[in-house]
């Protein structure tokens, strides 16, 4: 990823999230690592990653992740009861991954307060907003496929 693009994404997310309502950043493996690490450094908010393999640690939460594109398990570690979590994801399409992660965070007795996706395509964001009206869910870029063309939409 180009450093200038990563800096721009970091700056946009820093400006759009209510950091007074966040105790922990959560990224989703693998693109969650380069997206959330600079955010953690910039904001001073600790970071955890939803991983695709188990570490078998005490308190680990297994997530049954099923999307329109893949199926499998993910694992959450280091969530503390009562923590307020901001999830950062690279692409939000169907919302299946984020829905599974939200439910995993809740099983750990923590809460998701913010979700920000770098790219939104499809109806996943709307679906998640309908399912979770208490969570602030947004994207930086919204794309629509128009036949063979990709169309960038304004809010």
Named regions from a protein language model:
Residues 1-88, 92-155:
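PRPP-associated nucleotide enzymes
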